[in-house]
């Protein structure tokens, strides 16, 4: 077998492969034997059809099968022999073939680029330094108390976090609009459920009052006919309720986890907050490292690899929204191309870090990561056992750990500054992505 490789535009390559005639003929004869074993021809018993008839009837199909199989086999032999870093599927083009002659074909494909990392020392990373305070714990306790809260009717003026029952009628330029009217609508204020200015217009009014609120719909509002429009809402305030938070008693504490005292609950909450904080800081640092790697190392990515990643993102999107698998192909590729390209870039850059530094997965760290995940559940031992039985889940964790190790290698060479940050600020940044 002879092999010649041409470099085309960018990452495209073309390989021409020639396979010896005797190899093709030997494969052809074996293929005919297979046809002969199963061929049914009138006047002959199964497996007893003369060779000439078998060749006459099935020779063309047998040769096509042989040539197709040989292109696949010979190409992948060439990939191994020439150490080609293949990206995506090849396109085969057979040349004219005559029986008893050598067979040649071309395969066009893309390769992954050879990446030589540079500029790691120019990557700037700001690492949040956070101390979880007693005030942070108090806020988290209040969240739990609000989950168990009750409401008490009040004759006082509505405040920013009260719950109200209202009738309202909205109009634009004096005309009511669709979806702008409701009766006995219950609104828990302070959660930004309504358009800006709506809740603020209720604050200060008492039950039984009727009044108007002037607001402006945001430019990004979902209803096209209301975007940026000034509107008036006629409000009837029927009821005002104040939130009543439960006392921090042992009975209240026992509703959450295994804690028996307020001190136990605070310790448990702090442990959970520390875990969330660690994950958020790790994610923030990793994102900065990756952004820096991309900025310092502009690399061309194979279109085939991006296309494959687009398909992955399509399927994930359909699955996330509960659609049928066949709907994935209907989603426009351009919706996912930017994310797909970034994923391929990140994969190539981190793979280069891993390969260059000969990194191996830290198995102890894998065990610690699984244990940390399990600690968030009521039965951590069962979660650990579940990971032990599920090879794919464990492999996912191993990949995450190896990526973290690669990020740490880059981080050791980058310009890292520490910034004192509050718990709320870090978690808000995490929520924004």
UniProtKB/Swiss-Prot annotation:
Its main location: cytoplasm. It catalyses: [protein]-peptidylproline (omega=180) = [protein]-peptidylproline (omega=0). Disulfide bonds: none annotated. Its EC number is 5.2.1.8. The keyword Transmembrane does not apply. Coiled coil: none annotated. It is found in: Cytoplasm. SUPFAM superfamilies: FKBP-like, Triger factor/SurA peptide-binding domain-like, Trigger factor ribosome-binding domain. GO terms for biological process: 'de novo' cotranslational protein folding; cell division; chaperone-mediated protein folding; protein transport; protein unfolding. GO terms for cellular component: cytoplasm. GO terms for molecular function: peptidyl-prolyl cis-trans isomerase activity; protein folding chaperone; ribosome binding. Pfam families: FKBP_C, Trigger_C, Trigger_N. InterPro entries: PPIase_dom_sf, PPIase_FKBP_dom, Trig_fac, Trigger_fac_C, Trigger_fac_C_sf, Trigger_fac_ribosome-bd_bac, Trigger_fac_ribosome-bd_sf, Trigger_fact/SurA_dom_sf. The keyword Cell cycle applies. NCBIfam families: tig. Belongs to the FKBP-type PPIase family. Tig subfamily. Involved in protein export. Acts as a chaperone by maintaining the newly synthesized protein in an open conformation. Functions as a peptidyl-prolyl cis-trans isomerase. This is Trigger factor. The lineage of its organism: Bacteria, Pseudomonadati, Pseudomonadota, Gammaproteobacteria, Pasteurellales. The gene is tig.
């Amino acid at each position: 077998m002879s092999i010649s490789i041409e470099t085309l535009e960018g990452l495209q390559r073309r390989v021409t492969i020639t396979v010896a005639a005797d190899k093709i003929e030997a494969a052809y004869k074996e293929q005919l034997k297979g046809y002969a074993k199963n061929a049914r021809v009138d006047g002959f018993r199964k497996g007893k059809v003369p060779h000439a008839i078998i060749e006459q009837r099935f020779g063309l199909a047998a040769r096509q099968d042989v040539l197709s199989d040989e292109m696949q086999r010979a190409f992948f032999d060439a990939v191994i022999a020439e150490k080609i870093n293949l990206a995506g599927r090849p396109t085969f083009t057979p040349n004219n073939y005559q029986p008893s002659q050598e067979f040649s074909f071309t395969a066009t494909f893309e390769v992954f680029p050879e990446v030589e990392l540079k500029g790691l020392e120019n990557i700037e990373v700001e690492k949040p330094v956070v101390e979880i305070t007693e005030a942070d714990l108090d806020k988290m306790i209040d969240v739990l108390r609000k989950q168990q809260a009750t409401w008490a009717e009040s004759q006082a003026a509505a405040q920013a976090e009260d719950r109200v029952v209202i009738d309202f009628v909205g109009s634009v330029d004096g005309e009511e609009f669709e979806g702008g009217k409701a009766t006995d609508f219950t609104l828990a204020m302070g959660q930004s459920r309504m358009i800006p200015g709506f809740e603020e217009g209720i604050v200060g009014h008492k039950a039984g009052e009727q009044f108007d609120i002037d607001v402006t719909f945001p430019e990004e509002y979902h209803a096209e006919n209301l975007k940026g429009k000034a509107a008036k809402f006629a409000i009837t305030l029927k009821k005002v309720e104040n939130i009543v938070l439960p006392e921090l008693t042992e009975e209240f504490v026992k509703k959450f986890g295994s804690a028996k005292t307020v001190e136990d609950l605070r310790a448990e909450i702090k442990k959970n907050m520390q875990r969330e904080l660690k994950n958020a800081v790790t994610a923030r640092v990793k994102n900065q490292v990756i952004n820096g790697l991309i900025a310092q190392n502009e690399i061309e990515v194979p279109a085939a690899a991006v296309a494959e990643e687009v398909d992955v993102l399509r399927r994930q999107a359909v699955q996330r929204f509960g659609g049928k698998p066949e709907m994935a192909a209907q989603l426009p590729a351009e919706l996912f191309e930017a994310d797909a390209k970034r994923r391929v870039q990140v994969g190539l850059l981190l793979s280069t870090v891993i390969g260059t530094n000969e990194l191996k997965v830290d198995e102890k760290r894998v065990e610690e990561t699984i244990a940390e995940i399990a600690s968030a559940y009521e039965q951590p031992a069962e979660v650990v056992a579940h990971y032990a039985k599920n090879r794919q889940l464990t492999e996912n964790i191993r990949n995450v750990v190896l990526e973290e190790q690669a990020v740490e290698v880059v981080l050791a060479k980058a310009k890292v500054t520490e910034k004192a940050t509050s718990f709320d600020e870090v978690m808000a940044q995490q929520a924004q992505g």
